[in-house]
């Protein structure tokens, strides 16, 4: 049985031309790639004992794309049925295959755009909005942001570069990406206006009805009054940087590690560098993206659509890097705001990592891995020196990072060798992090599970996939207590908290709502810090147990209940 992603086969495909060529190549050439990928994936499903639902969804989703591209419409219903069977969340289960069914019927019946618009409104409108609403809004957002020039730019500036480095011997998933891009270009893009209009009609109908899920999260919260007898508590924010002007800090405010593992005491808030003058515009685009995902037609969302629609191929790379840099700039401050909300006794320690935002990956080496490992050990040692009680880790890593970088730089003899090398190098980092955390038994570490709707332990994420007595891994629920469609899950994900449209600070003091397990884990950090502040004599294990024992079971979700956890410790609120 396949028990981890590392056990899945790695394959390469020899291209005749650069990936961007296939965006406009004769269809027969793309069809040949589709046949190769389809044969390999089907062989895996037939011969390997794969039980991980997320992996099966990835396989079946690719096979569905290949069938649609090839015009094998008779295969679509069966693949959709298999895909739905692997969906264990109500939202994705409801929406899976609806669009594929419409496109299949449109092609088989040679229907026009008006028919497509009507069918989209009819079929998506028939779904339970409580389950399907977020998926419908997300699909509409993705369609509205489709820009073939942007896709062309990504191919030319990223995939082509990787293919040149590898002498056109590329990972099989690049071949699948080529087919998927042609499918979108040929089948979806011509119907974009009709598809968006149909989905907009569904969104508008439910907006008019003002259907909202009940909020069970907010009543569970509690704040500590400044006048209450409590003690200061050190809270580590191990993240991309924090604007410490917004928070009270520990005596030593923090430590910084660059992307290569080197430590400094500067740049606790990540510098924007040359992008600094454009911060107001970048902030608007991030806000616009969140509004766009929520199907809100705000000035910020309209500005985002205008910018994306106007992108030329040569601007794709710079736009992606701008968005990546901006996300890193805001992330840590937003997380910190959640972690210390309602706790005047919290003192923030910024454990800043200056992760790279460029599209080109680092060049892997054992020296790099050992520097990062040493950086992890030094960072945890600084937590002990500052006597922190709880540290939030809203980030994750895996061997896939190394495997991608090795592939990009064409290191290793073949795909399987790169997998081996990646695991070897990543183990240096993973083991150092695990051992350092285990060596700080009085500190409670809180990790975000991930946002890929997959299994943290199957993917072997760190820190989310680790099992340590002083670690809690957190999944994301919405305010109604339902698991979000994006949240990573698995046996190491032991508690859930609100990670949906959580409002917190940006650098400079403005506020914004963001989604993710990155927003869920600091909710648990927040609870732990409050418990430590109110009863400083509590041990790490007492606080961890109170958090877990206070959570309410809701299916596979165990939703944190801060008030109940406090009551279990005899804390009167």
Where do the language-model regions lie?
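Subtilisin-like serine protease catalytic core
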Residues: 220-371, 386, 468-470, 480-482, ...
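Substrate-binding/access-modulating region of protease and related hydrolase catalytic domains
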Residues: 322, 356-462, 510-515, 519-521
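Extracellular S/T/G-rich loop segment that most often corresponds to the catalytic His/Ser-adjacent loop
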Residues: 442, 448, 456-533, 537
């Amino acid at each position: 049985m396949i028990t981890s992603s590392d056990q899945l086969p790695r394959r390469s495909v020899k291209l005749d031309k650069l990936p961007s060529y296939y965006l406009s190549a004769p269809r027969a050439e793309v069809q040949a790639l589709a046949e190769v990928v389809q044969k390999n994936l089907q062989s895996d499903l037939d011969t390997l004992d794969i039980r991980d639902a997320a992996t099966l969804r990835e396989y079946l989703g690719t096979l569905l794309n290949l069938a649609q591209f090839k015009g094998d419409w008779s295969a679509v219903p069966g693949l959709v049925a298999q895909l739905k069977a692997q969906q264990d969340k109500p939202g994705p289960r409801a929406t899976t295959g609806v669009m594929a069914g419409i496109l299949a019927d449109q092609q088989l019946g040679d229907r026009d755009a008006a028919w497509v618009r009507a069918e989209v409104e009819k079929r998506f409108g028939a779904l339970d909005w409580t389950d399907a609403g977020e998926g419908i809004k997300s699909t509409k957002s993705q369609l509205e942001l489709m820009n073939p020039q942007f896709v062309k730019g990504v191919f030319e500036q990223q995939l082509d570069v990787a293919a040149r480095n590898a002498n056109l011997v590329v990972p099989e998933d690049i071949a699948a990406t080529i087919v998927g891009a042609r499918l979108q270009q040929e089948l979806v893009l011509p119907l974009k206006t009709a598809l968006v209009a149909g989905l907009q009609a569904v969104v508008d109908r439910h907006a008019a009805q003002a259907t909202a899920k009940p909020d069970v999260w907010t009543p569970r919260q509690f704040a500590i009054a400044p006048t209450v007898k409590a003690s200061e508590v050190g809270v580590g924010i191990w993240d991309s940087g924090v604007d410490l002007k917004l928070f009270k800090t520990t005596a030593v405010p923090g430590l910084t590690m660059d992307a290569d593992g080197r430590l400094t005491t500067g740049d606790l808030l990540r510098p924007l560098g040359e992008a600094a003058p454009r911060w107001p515009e970048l902030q608007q685009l991030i806000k616009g993206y969140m509004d766009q995902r929520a199907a809100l037609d705000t000035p910020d969302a309209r500005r985002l659509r205008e910018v994306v629609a106007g992108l030329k191929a040569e601007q794709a790379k710079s736009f992606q890097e701008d968005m990546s840099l901006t996300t890193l700039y805001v992330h840590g401050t937003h997380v910190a705001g959640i972690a210390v909300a309602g706790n005047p006794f919290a003192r923030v320690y910024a454990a800043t990592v200056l992760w790279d935002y460029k599209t080109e990956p680092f060049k892997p080496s054992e020296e790099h891995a050992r520097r990062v490992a040493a950086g992890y050990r030094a960072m945890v040692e600084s937590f002990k020196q500052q006597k922190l009680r709880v540290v939030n880790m809203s980030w994750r890593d895996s061997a896939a990072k190394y495997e991608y970088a090795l592939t990009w730089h064409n290191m290793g003899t073949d795909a399987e060798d790169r997998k081996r090398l990646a695991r070897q190098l990543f183990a240096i980092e993973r083991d150092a992090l695990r051992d350092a955390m285990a060596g700080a038994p009085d500190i409670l570490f809180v990790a975000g599970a991930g946002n890929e709707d997959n299994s943290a332990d199957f993917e072997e994420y760190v820190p989310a996939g680790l099992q340590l007595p002083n670690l809690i891994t957190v999944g994301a629920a919405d305010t109604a207590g339902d698991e979000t469609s994006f949240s990573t899950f698995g046996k190491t994900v032991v508690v859930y908290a609100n990670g949906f449209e959580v409002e917190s600070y940006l650098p400079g003091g403005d506020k914004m709502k963001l989604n993710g397990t990155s927003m869920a884990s600091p909710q648990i950090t927040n609870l732990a810090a409050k418990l430590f502040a109110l009863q400083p004599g509590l041990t790490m294990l007492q606080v961890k147990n109170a958090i877990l024992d206070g959570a309410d079971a809701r299916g596979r979700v165990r939703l944190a209940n801060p008030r109940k956890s406090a009551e279990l410790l005899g804390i009167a609120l």
